[in-house]
Amino acid sequence: MKTQVLSYNYNREHIKPGILHIGVGNFHRAHEEFYTNLLLEDPTQQDWGICGAMLLPGDERLYRILEKQKKEYTLTICGRDGKDQTYQIGSLIELIWGIENPAAIINKIADKNIHIITPVSYTH
């Protein structure tokens, strides 16, 4: 079965981070990133890209994968009707590996263009 991927229509080069999210895990990518991806389709909302900050040693593998993929990934939503939708997500504009560069996170917190800071929701 061939999967159709619905791609975003905005130019990522024009998107500016307005949200800093600390802890870029699965829940964040399936929810906050998805809805932000939809918002960025509106040309008047191009200042709401996401900067992700990853802090834990266990996050390094995902950080490296996302960097290699230019911070893009796909998300499949399994419909109750049995029809799935796969989206290309491009709302993650910037990614900081806090273990290598903790000062970059502090600088991003102080960035005047960051309007919202959201923390990781689920921890062990």
Regions found by a protein language model. Give the residues of each.
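An N-terminal structural lobe/cap that precedes and organizes the functional/catalytic core
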Residues: 2-101, 105
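Short beta-strand segments
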Residues: 54, 118-120
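Short, charge-rich binding segments
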Residues: 107-111
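Conserved acidic residues
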Residues: 115
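Conserved small/polar residues in nucleotide/adenosyl-binding loops
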Residues: 123-124
